[in-house]
Amino acid sequence: MLRRKPIDAGQLDLQEKVVEVRRVTKVVKGGRNFRFAALVVVGDENGHVGIGAGKAMEVPDAIKKAVEDAKKNLIVVPIVGTTIPHEVRGHFGAGNILIMPAVEGTGVIAGGPARAVLELAGLKDVRAKSLGSNNPRNMVNATIEGLNSLKTVEDIAKLRGKKVEELLG
């Protein structure tokens, strides 16, 4: 497995998308305590994307915490032209997603939370199909896990100790 270097979020021009904001409740002896949980995706539309979650008493604070968390969890997505190098499956909890490369001009064909991740990663032509849970947290994590497992031909050649030409025949 290739070791991934930590990414400095300060040097990237990151955009953020709020995927989900939920009101969560803690029931105590004196009644109910309400807080807000936010799920946010950040990315520079140039191969860097991350997800984060945050909780707070107010929605803006929860979003702010989620953005900070997302900046700590950035990954690099290998992009070939405007799409991904190969088909990949992501799995997290009950969330399963199939991400497939697409020809130029196709656009991003993906549902809900997965679309936010793929767009902020900088992918212009890609198809995705959710095969499991439609829970936003599981879908986003499955998408990130799938994108994180992508490898380019150069990566595979380096792992096998061969040249790219040998692999491609």
UniProtKB/Swiss-Prot annotation:
Q: Which keywords does UniProt give here?
A: Ribonucleoprotein, Ribosomal protein, RNA-binding, rRNA-binding
The species this protein belongs to is: Clostridioides difficile (strain 630)
Name the family the entry cites: Belongs to the universal ribosomal protein uS5 family.
User: Can you tell which superkingdom this protein's organism belongs to?
Assistant: Bacteria
The name this protein carries in UniProt is: Small ribosomal subunit protein uS5
Which stretches make up the S5 DRBM domain? 14-77
Which terms does the record give in the GO molecular function aspect?
Answer: rRNA binding; structural constituent of ribosome
Q: Which SUPFAM superfamilies match?
A: dsRNA-binding domain-like, Ribosomal protein S5 domain 2-like
> What's the stated role of this polypeptide?
With S4 and S12 plays an important role in translational accuracy. Located at the back of the 30S subunit body where it stabilizes the conformation of the head with respect to the body.
Q: Does the keyword Ribonucleoprotein apply?
A: yes
Coiled-coil regions listed in the entry: none
Oligomeric state and interaction partners are given as: Part of the 30S ribosomal subunit. Contacts proteins S4 and S8.
Which GO BP terms sit in this record? translation
Entry's Gene Ontology cellular component terms: small ribosomal subunit
Q: What is known of its domains?
A: The N-terminal domain interacts with the head of the 30S subunit; the C-terminal domain interacts with the body and contacts protein S4. The interaction surface between S4 and S5 is involved in control of translational fidelity.
